[in-house]
Amino acid sequence: MKAYLALISAAVIGLAACSQEPAAPAAEATPAAEAPASEAPAAEAAPADAAEAPAAGNCAATVESNDNMQFNTKDIQVSKACKEFTITLKHTGTQPKASMGHNLVIAKAEDMDGVFKDGVGAADTDYVKPDDARVVAHTKLIGGGEESSLTLDPAKLADGDYKFACTFPGHGALMNGKVTLVD
């Protein structure tokens, strides 16, 4: 039986090698849709700390999130010179918010654990406890392809160390960073 399989394999290889058809170009050999997960597109595979969301006299920043539970920044710089500062959260992934939803919540660093714990039971309010005084500002929970914005007074950030995080259960350990007041 082994000899029979070996003979058939050799015949198939021989016929394929002697084919009159030219070899397919390398680009066609592995379509992008069939690439393994480890070869994810650069936008989703970029390290979360690769960029800062700069203030630079600008009173707005954009933070992107993806299906890999990553923000594209670990530091949001807020200018003291701004009367209001707007942060837009864009979910660049495709997963729905029920399974891979993201929000952006700002609170003092020492309050963030409590914000997470209280948010777990608040699915109806985007995993943020209603009227939580520890929360400076937050976006709504969004799914792939959606965006949401928050606006805050930079003066609220003057008295301590602040963090931002996603409060969707289980996401905060990976999806967090600092909010830095600059200028």
Curated annotation (Swiss-Prot):
Its cofactor is Cu cation. Coiled coil: none annotated. It is a lipid-anchor. A lipid is attached at residue 18 (N-palmitoyl cysteine). Its main location: membrane. Residues 57-183 form the Plastocyanin-like domain. Cu cation binds at residues 102, 166, 171, 175. Residues 27-51 are annotated as: Disordered. InterPro entries: Azurin, BlueCu_1, BlueCu_1_BS, Cu-binding_ET, Cupredoxin. One of its GO terms (cellular component) is cell outer membrane. Keywords: Cell outer membrane, Copper, Electron transport, Lipoprotein, Membrane, Metal-binding, Palmitate, Signal, Transport. A lipid is attached at residue 18 (S-diacylglycerol cysteine). PANTHER family: AURACYANIN-B, OUTER MEMBRANE PROTEIN H.8. This is Outer membrane protein H.8.
